[in-house]
Amino acid sequence: PVIECDDEIVANEIFEVKVGLGKEVAHPNTTEHHIRWIRLYFHPEDAKYPYEIGNFEFNAHGESSAGPNEGSVYAHHQVTAQMKTAQPGTLHAMAFCNIHGLWENSKELGIK
């Protein structure tokens, strides 16, 4: 997953974090091959455990009683979360592809 946000944020001010897949090459979004979920965590420096920021499920991939990919609704595998923190640390994103399994990425977050 690609994590997009400023490298440094202002302590205790809300900021946006975008997480998605396929920024350079589009990831398939079909009944047979899709991203099922994205999870975002923040691990403050010197903290023992991370905090879960969000758990996002994508449940529509063109399914239909008429058959695979015959439905008209597709959830897109990108999310925007808002958060704030007083500490620097690391953002961790995980995404699950029903074919290729778990993908992970991280990004350091500093405080101005």
Predicted regions and their residues:
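Extended low-complexity, serine/threonine- and proline-enriched intrinsically disordered segments
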Residues: 32-54
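Short, hydrophobic beta-strand segments
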Residues: 79-87
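Solvent-exposed serine/threonine-rich low-complexity stretches and specific carbohydrate-binding patches
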Residues: 51-68
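Short, compositionally biased P/S/T/A/G/V-rich stretches that sit at domain boundaries
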Residues: 1-10
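Short amphipathic, basic-aromatic surface patches that mediate peripheral association
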Residues: 20-31
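Aromatic sugar-binding surface patches on proteins
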Residues: 69-80
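Short acidic/polar inter-strand loop motif in beta-rich domains
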Residues: 96-106
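Extracellular Ig-like/FN3 beta-sandwich strand-entry sites
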Residues: 14, 86-92
